[in-house]
């Protein structure tokens, strides 16, 4: 606990346990012995600094760790703790609450999800470095969020106690909303990458060779929320952040 601190979140990267915590640290531990190995990178506005330890991803094919940097940049480190490079996605997300989240597909390809706005549909993009391999709109009807201005907001609270974190926003018109701050839509099973959009009932497989392939449909039942209901205060409702 003296090394990690509160709000720890652990994932596996090859032979290491990767732990991020509220102390803005990313640390590697030996998967077999639990022994501390090293810290990776740091939060800072210098050329090798990232903006947050939360919301990044690790690629077992390359042994690299990716963190959100500044101005739409992704800061990449090797598991040896050395800074590797900065990657700037060729497709940028609109202003908050629109978001772009990323995960690896294989050693060369990165998948990105861009949420819908009032002018653009939600999209999945595949990148190979600076090359855009494919951009695909999600095959579901949806409404998008308009950009938020400070004049619209009464209060903002941010929870970062483990995981990627959530932003709680209360608006002047009486509405409220919760927005995930990291990757809540991609996950891996074996060598396959899967995707599920918040509030949607369909799970898709992401592939380099094919368009999005629906593989499962969830019966959301009472957890199915219409777009307008997502902004209502409900004391008897639980926000469905993830279905795995």
Task: Please identify what each model-predicted range represents.
Residues 2-4, 49-53, 95-97, 179-180:
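Short loop/turn positions that demarcate and connect the beta-strands within blades
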Residues 35-71, 87-95:
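Blade-loop segments of beta-propeller domains
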Residues 13-21, 63-69, 75, 107-119, ...:
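Short beta-strand elements that form the blades of beta-propeller/WD-repeat-like
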Residues 1-25, 54-55:
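Beta-strand-rich domains and repeat architectures in extracellular enzymes and scaffolds
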Residues 7-11, 54-61, 100-107, 115-116, ...:
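Structural signature of eukaryotic scaffold interfaces centered on beta-propeller domains
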Residues 74-75, 85-113:
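Long, hydrophobic, well-ordered secondary-structure blocks that form the structural core
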Residues 1, 25-43, 73-91, 121-177, ...:
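Surface-exposed loop/turn elements that mediate protein-protein interactions on large endomembrane-trafficking
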